[in-house]
Amino acid sequence: MGTISKTDLKQQIKDGIIVSCQALPGEPLYREEGGIMPLLVKAAQEAGAVGIRANSVRDIKEIKEVTTLPIIGIIKRDYPPQEPFITATMREVDELAALDIEVIALDCTKRERYDGLDIVDFIKQIKEKYPEQLFMADISTFEEGLTAYEAGIDFIGTTLSGYTSYSRQEEGPDIELVDRLCRAGIDVIAEGKIHYPDQVKIIHDLGVAGIVVGGAITRPKEIAERFISALHK
């Protein structure tokens, strides 16, 4: 498990960008044999990224070979019919904890979980099992963020705003949610639908602990689609 202190990590990631480097099966940059994500990480590091968010044991192992930047790790694994799929059970937490990464991120929404646990009970379990590990809650509403933070989660990520049926549906980042969480004294890592540099500046000035940008940097198909669609508006 990661051994960095929360204070030290906050110092490392403040005033910078954490770049999410992920590709899922069916996406252009996904290869069964791997090897692509470390290249994206190298590019992000050369650009000045202060951290990396990555998915899967394989990708994280490969990424750790090319960078010493702090890593926020997740495992995306479906558990139908339940909706949560980002580090959704103790199985994924165990797999990530074995990788010695700085932060483990997990779904902390109020949606029904595959393991049947209340999210507060699950947080209690992972904190007891891995007391030195830093955790990030991926949430979609203020109430979810507050619940996770009060339960002991270190960082609250706005990752899932717009991706749950009951959260705010917007084209861009949920800046209002970020602002409200920051005003509540919560350590926020803003993430989700951050497409443009000017949005990053606005979010930074709200007082966040960190900012994650993914698709706008590391998903070339998504980037190309944004340019192409602009021609037809």
UniProtKB/Swiss-Prot annotation:
Instruction: Report the EC code(s) recorded for this entry.
Output: 5.1.3.9
What domain of life does the native source organism fall in?
Bacteria
Pathway listed for it is:
Amino-sugar metabolism; N-acetylneuraminate degradation; D-fructose 6-phosphate from N-acetylneuraminate: step 3/5
Molecular function GO labels: N-acylglucosamine-6-phosphate 2-epimerase activity
EC top class, in one word? isomerase
Q: Does the keyword Lipoprotein apply?
A: no
CC annotations in GO: cytosol
Listed GO biological process terms = carbohydrate metabolic process; N-acetylmannosamine catabolic process; N-acetylneuraminate catabolic process
Q: Reaction(s) catalyzed by this protein?
A: an N-acyl-D-glucosamine 6-phosphate = an N-acyl-D-mannosamine 6-phosphate
What InterPro entries does its record include?
Aldolase_TIM, NanE, RibuloseP-bd_barrel
- Family of this protein: Belongs to the NanE family.
- Spell out the NCBIfam families in the cross-references: PRK01130.1
Q: What is this protein called?
A: Putative N-acetylmannosamine-6-phosphate 2-epimerase
Q: Which organism is it from?
A: Streptococcus suis (strain 05ZYH33)
